[in-house]
């Protein structure tokens, strides 16, 4: 388990490129036949990926020991979105088939967590966010058909994008975790611009659907102290509540956002005008 500490905004603005990347960037999300796990002190979120190829992958009691409990979900909830080939997640003996861009919410108290791919040649890529939870909500699958997409932005400002809200109160109940998937229209490059912060929630982005020769310049920092991190395909970045989180790519891309914090009100944002950025 890779542990990342919280960083004060005054400290963050003094960091050089390599230190910014070390503190906020998660480079290796998917590793064949393993799970990856990054534990952030910011709202205690855990972020990672699971890619079964030649055999199934189980998250067992070894993780619980690192959290001071018996199992990962003794006091946590888990949200998973599959960005790879078809697979399945077995939760306490019950199999849930999870296709490309299907998602599964797993509530507090689940014990057995086994992840499998249907085909080794096209393995599932289960990206997950895991947050502290104090109530057990039912495990539930969410498919793209269950989500009402919202299209925002404009081609003229290069930010036309479709937002798919998977884990939000209108779709299912969670303790605090919210997750969704935003896809930029072809030829569009910007996400979340004009940008915002939200003092009451932190956020994690996973960028994917990127070609090998492309990148995203992820903008972070306080609005008057902006910095950037260069992101490649299937990399994630941690965004503290004091930081903007926006990006511009060399080509169109897709990203998964996950939030935890005080509330689940999607529009609870502190907007920042473009002319106020520095």
Curated annotation (Swiss-Prot):
Q: Give the SUPFAM superfamilies listed for this entry.
A: RmlC-like cupins
What cofactor(s) does the depicted protein rely on? Zn(2+)
Q: Name one Pfam family in it.
A: KduI
Cofactor remark = Binds 1 zinc ion per subunit.
Q: Its catalytic activity?
A: 5-dehydro-4-deoxy-D-glucuronate = 3-deoxy-D-glycero-2,5-hexodiulosonate
Keywords assigned: Isomerase, Metal-binding, Zinc
* A Gene Ontology biological process term: pectin catabolic process
**Where does this protein act, in terms of pathway?**
Glycan metabolism; pectin degradation; 2-dehydro-3-deoxy-D-gluconate from pectin: step 4/5
One GO molecular function term of this record is: zinc ion binding
**List of residues binding Zn(2+):** 196, 198, 203, 245
Q: Determine if Transcription regulation is one of this entry's keywords.
A: no
Enzyme Commission number(s): 5.3.1.17
Protein's UniProt keywords contain Transmembrane helix: no
The organism's place on the tree of life at top rank: Bacteria
Family, similarity comment:
Belongs to the KduI family.
| Function noted in UniProt | Catalyzes the isomerization of 5-dehydro-4-deoxy-D-glucuronate to 3-deoxy-D-glycero-2,5-hexodiulosonate.
Query: Any idea what this protein is called?
Result: 4-deoxy-L-threo-5-hexosulose-uronate ketol-isomerase
Classification of source organism:
Bacteria, Pseudomonadati, Pseudomonadota, Gammaproteobacteria, Enterobacterales
């Amino acid at each position: 388990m890779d542990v990342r500490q919280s960083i004060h905004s005054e400290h963050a603005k003094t960091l050089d490129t390599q230190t910014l990347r070390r503190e906020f960037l998660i480079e290796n999300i998917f590793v064949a036949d393993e799970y990856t796990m990054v534990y952030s002190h910011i709202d205690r979120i855990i972020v990672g990926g699971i890619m079964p190829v030649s055999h199934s992958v189980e998250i067992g009691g070894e993780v619980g020991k690192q959290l001071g409990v018996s199992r990962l979900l003794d006091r946590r909830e888990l949200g998973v979105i599959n960005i790879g080939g078809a697979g399945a997640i077995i939760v306490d003996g019950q199999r849930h088939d999870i296709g490309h861009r299907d998602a599964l919410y797993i509530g507090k108290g689940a014990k057995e967590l086994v992840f499998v791919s249907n085909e080794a040649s096209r393995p599932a890529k289960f990206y997950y966010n895991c947050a502290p939870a104090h109530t057990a909500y039912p495990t539930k699958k969410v498919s793209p058909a269950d989500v009402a997409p919202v299209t925002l932005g404009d081609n003229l400002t290069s930010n036309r994008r479709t937002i798919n809200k998977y884990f939000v109160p209108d779709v299912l109940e969670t303790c605090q975790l919210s997750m969704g998937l935003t896809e930029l229209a072809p030829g569009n490059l910007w996400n979340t611009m004009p940008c915002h912060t939200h003092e009451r929630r932190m956020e994690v982005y996973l960028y994917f659907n990127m070609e090998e020769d492309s990148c995203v310049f992820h903008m972070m920092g306080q609005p008057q102290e902006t910095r950037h991190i260069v992101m490649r395909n299937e990399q994630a970045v941690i965004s503290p509540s004091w930081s903007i989180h926006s990006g511009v790519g060399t080509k169109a891309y897709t990203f998964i956002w996950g939030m935890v914090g005080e509330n689940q009100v999607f529009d609870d944002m502190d907007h920042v005008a473009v002319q106020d950025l520095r």
